[in-house]
């Protein structure tokens, strides 16, 4: 499954996680991506959308 939102372009972020003793380990933060059927240019299509775009109404779902 794609790890990028097709509406806002939000994707995976790389960084460093610190423990209490300040040891480092590399890790990734992935967005909450959902596969939904939406209306794109008048036709229903399956796209990958983050949960924030779904909640804010940037996507019109196909029923």
UniProtKB/Swiss-Prot annotation:
The protein's name: Large ribosomal subunit protein bL28
Matches recorded under InterPro entries: Bacterial_rp_bL28, Ribosomal_bL28, Ribosomal_bL28/bL31-like_sf, Ribosomal_bL28_bact-type, Ribosomal_bL28_sf
GO MF entry, a single one: structural constituent of ribosome
GO CC field: ribonucleoprotein complex; ribosome
Keywords: Ribonucleoprotein, Ribosomal protein
Any one GO BP annotation for this protein: translation
Family label: Belongs to the bacterial ribosomal protein bL28 family.
Biological classification of the source: Bacteria, Bacillati, Bacillota, Clostridia, Eubacteriales
Matches recorded under Pfam families: Ribosomal_L28
């Amino acid at each position: 499954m794609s790890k990028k939102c097709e509406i806002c372009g939000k994707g995976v972020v790389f960084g460093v996680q610190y423990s209490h003793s300040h040891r480092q380990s590399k890790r990734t933060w992935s967005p909450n991506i959902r596969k939904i059927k939406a209306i794109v240019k008048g036709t229903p299509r399956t796209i990958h959308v983050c949960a924030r775009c779904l909640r804010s109404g940037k996507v019109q779902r196909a029923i």
